[in-house]
Amino acid sequence: MRKQSKIIFYAGIVLGFAAVLTGVALSGGRKIPKDFTVSYEGIKTADITAGVSVHDPSVIEVDGTYYIFGSHMSGASSEDLRNWTSIGDGYTSSNPIFDDLLGTEHVFDYTGSRDSVIPTDDGTYHVWAPDVVYNRAQDLYYMYFCTSSTWNASNLCYAVSDKPEGPYTWKGALIYSGFTKDTIEATDVLDYVDIDYAKKNYIMAGNKYNYEKYPNAIDPTVFYDADGKMWMVYGSWSGGIFLLEIDEKTGLVIHPKEDEKNGVDPYFGKRLLGGGHKSIEGPYILYDEESGYYYLFVSYGSLTSCLLYTSPSPRDRG
């Protein structure tokens, strides 16, 4: 029996996963649906052998070599996407992916370790969900990742290397979440909004972080748009998925002007979707040059669930 399905792009390694993806093509100014139907007839499943284990994977290809990075300071490389060689793994100072991340000052000041302002809930290190992107302006590789302590207290960070495999040197923190009136001074939030705005919007009654409206600062991915601008999409559960522009010359986020009507916060950026602490996480935005559309992928619900949104602009949900 001949089986057909629609292809979906997944930001990582695709292992026998199929779903529905609807695209568009432009012809004479009209948008014509693109059919991604393919046949899997004759395709066999490869043997699975013991290899590397990478959670929350992000893959980048450089000169024919694929590099995969994941949570817990793990990474590997491959030339065929089947046979992988470990680069590093685990929370050790000698992990070659980083330039002694555990021994670098200020990395875990706010979250991510038992000694942080907000300690990890299990007393161990939490370094999660890295995404590596080549910065065209600087000819450097940037790794965006997060340290996290609880289900909403997290910190987006970045590190830099001149080689895709590393070592990556930590450069600084970008976005903080999960703060209260007692911990906001340990963040950079008040560099961008005043204390009255922060108390009104970010902190709920009972001195709790307003997690239903604002994000958990984890799961970052970075991409270039059609005009060459860099963007970072991030978020998990909590207030949903958010978008911030990246300054290509520095690798830092650009905090926008407040635009409440269009869901733009001066610190966290543009909320794309989600909120109310509903299931949604792991955002990834793919720009398709042929259609001129951006595809936003997120995971939600159970292990097998996935959502797809399309838009002609990276700042809007289609």
Where are these regions (language model features)?
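Surface loop/turn signatures of beta-propeller and other carbohydrate-active proteins
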Residues: 29-61, 85-133, 167-224, 249-286, ...
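Hydrophobic core segments of beta-strands in well-ordered, beta-rich domains
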Residues: 55-73, 127-151, 170-171, 219-243, ...
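Gram-positive cell-envelope targeting signals
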Residues: 1-29
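Short loop/turn segments that connect beta-strands within beta-propeller blades
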Residues: 79-82, 163-164, 247-249
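Conserved blade-register residue in beta-propeller folds
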Residues: 75-77, 158-160, 243-245
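Conserved small/polar residues in nucleotide/adenosyl-binding loops
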Residues: 309-316
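Short consensus segments that form the blades of beta-propeller domains
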Residues: 120-123, 148-151, 210-212, 301-305
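Eukaryote-specific detector of the first structured module of a protein
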Residues: 67-68, 78, 86
